Swiss-Prot record:
UniProt subunit comment: Forms a heterotetramer with UvrB during the search for lesions.
Annotated compartments: Cytoplasm
Residues of the ABC transporter domain: 327-605, 625-953
A GO cellular component annotation in the UniProt record: cytoplasm
Naturally occurring in which organism (per UniProt): Treponema pallidum (strain Nichols)
Residues binding ATP, per UniProt: 35-42, 657-664
Stored HAMAP family: UvrA
Family that this chain belongs to: Belongs to the ABC transporter superfamily. UvrA family.
Pfam families for the chain: UvrA_DNA-bind, UvrA_inter
Domain of life (superkingdom): Bacteria
Molecular function via GO: ATP binding; ATP hydrolysis activity; DNA binding; excinuclease ABC activity; zinc ion binding
Free-text function comment from the UniProt entry: The UvrABC repair system catalyzes the recognition and processing of DNA lesions. UvrA is an ATPase and a DNA-binding protein. A damage recognition complex composed of 2 UvrA and 2 UvrB subunits scans DNA for abnormalities. When the presence of a lesion has been verified by UvrB, the UvrA molecules dissociate.
Name of this protein: UvrABC system protein A
Cytoplasm recorded as keyword: yes
Length: 960
């Protein structure tokens, strides 16, 4: 057997910064590619191996199919042998569709729909009575179980809650030979004159038969049931009385006992409310199909409405002061109409909105109804004055009209700033029609079941009680559901609910969901390529993830993982360590082999870290702060259980806890907006808490997250940190530029003048693909340089502006060493480990971790105040241990300057660096949200209830 059959052989890989490397990877093994950020890991795994696998797959398709997929370029590699079908599971949150949920992405919701369609119990959406579709034999069998000797009356419900005299209905029943009817609860003889108020709603049941039950009446009962069902269009009501029946007195029969009432239907209808329920089909439970979706919100569960707080952000202002943002007072059309409103409804245009009467504000917002306003409006050209007499539509109605009539994206954007998302009032956010939500399994409808966490859902199905028939029907469906739920648990996502919108998932969560889906497919002989699946996972959950990866391998697959996590590296069958540096200094294979073999290689930073030769030292002294404390009281947003949190200012604090325990809710949803609004005079929506103290000790709050630094090809690190402004100014001072009269704007790709007008300075042409992602191709005029020939003719130290943008940040720092303002900003980028990134690299190509560090560099390049609070959300994402050392030096320097750093983090090497740890838990979802432990890492390690404490203890013992 050749090596290609046992191994994946890559020869001459040169993609991006790879240095013509040869790599041999074992198949059917867990292989980890490690190395510094920017060393070429993704270039090897995704841009070379996966890209070639994808290209070969497309090449195998017919010419007809290939025309829809386009041509895929061959990666810059000599050859790849032994390549299996490849599946890439990346960090990207691809589902931006608001209809996509965790349940739909994992297909669990599809099985839920099938389960409810097959064994769900339908109820009337109005009265909640159970509705069963039954045959005549089933109805008779049910009635024969009533104790012998009981008297029953078979009633045909012919009118349900309808106005009218219903004379024709009663007359028809009399002609058909029926003697009695129950009208509005009273039993009446039909031969008497019955007069009903036509303005009131009535319910009429025709008495078809009265039977005393015994073993000998089955035949008569069957005939009467058939007659009743035929007369009432498949509906039947049965009054059951004990042996002590009432007597007939005059026209009304009364019962000595309170009769019980039974309802039957042949057609999934409620006999009591005369409401039909559709046949139970899977589509009835789909919020993506009109058959099941709530008609008000079309199955989204939310609606966009114009928000008064956005239209009038400052209610202390008047109309004349511009209180109503979409209605500027300087526009005469607005002014004359508001003046007419003020005159008619007795308020002044100088009155602050807060002081307007409720009636006046209601008219302004919702319109004057049928009451007309009279006002005059002079035409712009002054030709004549038009006189209007018509009702005022109201601000909300007019904005809806303008928004609906907007023809361009920019016009719609103007009005979208005044919209806010509200829960749909019709379905209360449950997305489905009332008929769909009235179907239950063990008293839970499909939305209530989807609202459970994965962990709670597993428990629900373990304790589900079914009849023998139901169990037989649902057996295979339940197996598919429980298998998929367990896969989600195994990748650390037990805290997620199936109703969670896919667009709100982090990149790591989205990746692990796709991983769980792949495990469910049980494919073999596949090459799986994953990008840091441990991102966002607590150490406890990470152990289960590793077991999942090993299970995927044991199925007969090759699992190739780009990873920095120590646990994953130690269990790998094979490690390929790239380096030795990043960017131009990387791209070589520094070490390859089993973990013990890699540890023997002195040049491998990864190997030395695993061997314990390189460590992040534990601080000798923990800071106690500057004496001031920030306290947030009674936090109860999402799953947080009315906790109060104290953060000592002037310290480095880590927020820890298992996945879903409430870390992001506390820091991002509550603390950051609360501080930003009070310290920075912002207007961010705040999470729920009662009060906050200590904000007066801060003068700035900075949140450094992982969102992109820009969403177009023009956005790049140089523009984001502002260094490109200094570079453009420098180029404008070059003698050639002065001679040509070029200003700094000439060297900008955002404005006309010096940029290539064919691509508008993007360097690429964007091709919109409608329902597919946009495609970018290199501009064939400027060939990606972004500028026209005249601009590129200006040189500084032998380089033009395009050459500079193509430099790595490290190269640029050396190139501009004589220009302090430029060096200071580039130094900040280098200090956070981004020296390998190119100055002009498109923001679209930066990972979340890289984008976060660019933002951090921007803040580092500013003058420190010593009273700033920095908030970080897992800043070690995508970082090698050596990069983490560099990052922690920056963080500790910020705190040494008197600032406060609060960070969500799972990396134990970072957590033990903190002055204080706040550990949330004990579990995720509704089982979390409390403070399990708080104090120094040493103190937290002694608390047995703290999951994080267990792992802190391990790290502290290992390093001491």
């Amino acid at each position: 057997m050749g090596s290609a059959a046992r191994n994946l052989c890559i020869k001459g890989a040169r993609e991006h910064n790879l240095k013509n490397i040869d790599v041999m990877l074992p198949r059917d093994a867990l292989v980890v590619i490690s190395g510094l950020s920017g060393s070429g890991k993704s270039s090897l795994a995704f841009d070379t191996i996966f890209a070639e696998g994808q290209r070969r797959y497309v090449e195998s398709l017919s010419a007809y199919a290939r025309q829809f997929l386009g041509r895929l370029d061959k990666p810059d590699v000599d050859s790849i042998e032994g390549l299996s079908p490849a599946i890439a599971i990346e960090q990207k949150t691809t589902q931006r569709n608001p209809r996509s949920t965790v349940g739909t992405v994992t297909e669990i919701y599809d099985y839920y729909r099938l389960l409810f369609a097959r064994i769900g119990r339908a109820h009337c959406p109005h009265c909640a009575r159970e509705i069963k579709e039954q045959t005549v034999d089933q109805i008779v069998d049910t009635l024969m179980t009533v104790p012998s000797g009981s008297r029953i009356q078979l009633l045909a419900p012919v009118v349900r809650g309808k106005k009218g005299t219903h004379h024709k209905v009663l007359e028809a029943a009399r002609k058909d030979g029926f003697v009695r009817a129950r009208i509005d609860g009273a039993l009446l003889h039909l031969h008497e004159r019955i007069s009903l108020d036509k303005q009131k709603k009535h319910s009429i049941d025709i008495v078809v038969d009265r039977i005393q039950l015994s073993d000998t009446v089955r035949k008569r009962l069957t005939e009467s049931v058939e007659t009743t069902l035929g007369y009432a269009d498949g509906l039947l009501t049965v009054l059951v009385q004990g042996e002590n029946s009432g007597t007939v007195s005059g026209k009304i029969e009364t019962s000595a006992l309170l009769p019980s009432e039974l309802f039957f239907s042949q057609k999934n209808a409620c006999a009591h409310c005369n409401v039909s329920v559709p046949e139970l089909q899977p589509r009835l439970f789909s919020f993506n199909a009109p058959f099941g979706a709530c008609p008000s919100c079309a199955g989204l569960g939310i609606m966009q409405t114009f928000d008064l707080d956005r239209i009038v952000p400052d209610q202390n202002r008047s109309f004349n002061e511009g209180a109503f943002l979409p209605f500027k007072p300087e526009h005469e059309w607005n002014r004359v109409r508001f003046a007419a409103l003020a005159e008619k409804y007795h308020f002044s245009l100088d009155d602050p909105v807060r002081n307007l009467s409720k009636h006046a504000l209601d008219i302004i917002l919702h319109g004057s109804g049928s009451e007309a306003l009279e006002f005059s409006h002079e035409r712009k050209d002054g030709s004549r004055t038009a006189r209007y007499i018509k009702p005022w539509p109201g601000i909300f109605s007019e904005l809806h009209r303008r928004y609906a009539e907007s023809c361009t994206h920019s016009q719609r954007e103007v009005y979208e700033r005044y919209l806010s998302v509200r829960t749909c009032e019709a379905c209360r956010g449950m997305r489905l029609k009332p008929e769909s939500l009235a179907v239950t399994i063990e008293k839970k409808n499909i939305h209530a079941l989807s609202a459970l966490s994965v962990d709670d859902s597993c428990e629900f199905f373990k304790t589900l009680h079914l009849t023998e028939v139901e169990a037989t029907i649902a057996q295979q469906i339940l197996k598919e559901i429980t298998d998929r739920l367990e896969f989600l648990q195994n990748v650390g996502l037990g805290y997620l609910t199936l109703e969670r919108a896919a667009a709100t998932l982090s990149g790591g969560e989205a990746q692990r969901i796709r991983l769980a889906t792949q495990i469910g497919s049980r494919l073999t002989g596949v090459l799986y390529i994953l990008d840091e699946p441990s991102i966002g996972l607590h150490q406890r959950d990470n152990e289960r993830l590793i077991q999942t990866l090993l299970h995927l391998r044991d199925l007969g697959n090759t699992v190739l993982v780009v990873e920095h996590d120590e646990q994953t590296l130690r269990v790998a069958d094979y490690i390929v360590d790239l380096g030795p540096g990043a960017g131009v200094h990387g791209g070589y294979v520094v070490a390859a082999g089993s973990p013990p073999e890699v540890m023997q290689v002195q040049a491998s930073l990864t190997g030395q870290y695993l061997a314990g030769a390189i460590t992040l030292p534990i601080p000798a002294v923990r800071r106690t702060g500057n004496g001031n404390v920030l306290t947030v009281h009674d936090v109860h947003e999402h799953n947080l259980q009315h906790i109060s949190v104290r953060i000592r200012l002037g310290t480095f604090t880590c927020i820890t806890g298992v996945s879903g325990s409430g870390k992001s809710t506390l820091l991002i949803d509550v603390l950051y907006p609360a501080l930003y609004n009070r310290v920075m005079n912002g207007r961010l929506p705040e999470g729920k808490f009662s009060s906050i103290e200590g904000t007066e000790h801060l003068d700035k709050v900075i949140y450094v997250d992982q969102s992109p630094i820009g969403r177009t090809p023009r956005s790049n690190p140089a523009t984001y940190v502002g260094v490109f402004t200094d570079i453009r100014m420098l180029f404008s001072q070059v003698p050639e530029a002065k001679m040509r009269g070029y200003k700094p704007g000439r060297f900008s790709f955002n404005v006309p003048g010096g940029r290539c007008e064919h691509c508008k300075g993007d360097g690429v042409i964007t091709i919109e693909m409608n329902f597919l992602p946009d495609v970018y191709i290199t501009c064939d005029v400027c060939h990606g340089t972004r500028f026209n020939r005249e601009t590129l003719a200006v040189f500084y130290k032998g380089k033009n502006i395009s050459h500079v943008l193509d430099m790595t940040i490290e190269e640029a720092r050396s190139f501009f060493s004589a220009v302090p303002p430029i060096v200071r900003k580039l130094e900040a980028l280098c200090s956070v480990g981004l020296g390998y990134v190119r100055l002009g690299q498109s923001a679209l190509t930066l990972s979340g971790g890289e984008a976060q560090r660019v933002k951090l560099a921007l803040e580092l390049s500013k003058r420190a105040t010593g009273k700033t609070l920095y908030i970080f959300d897992e800043p070690t994402t995508g970082l090698h241990f050596a990069d983490i050392i560099q990052l922690m030096e920056v963080v500790q320097r910020l705190v040494d300057q008197g600032n406060t750093v609060v960070m969500i983090e799972h990396n134990m090497d970072v957590i033990v660096q903190a002055d204080c740890v706040i550990d949330l838990g004990p579990e995720g979802g509704m089982h979390g949200g409390t403070i399990v432990a708080q104090g120094s890492p040493e103190a937290v390690s002694q608390i047995t209830e703290s999951r994080t404490g267990w792992y802190i203890k391990e790290v502290l013992c290992k390093k001491t």
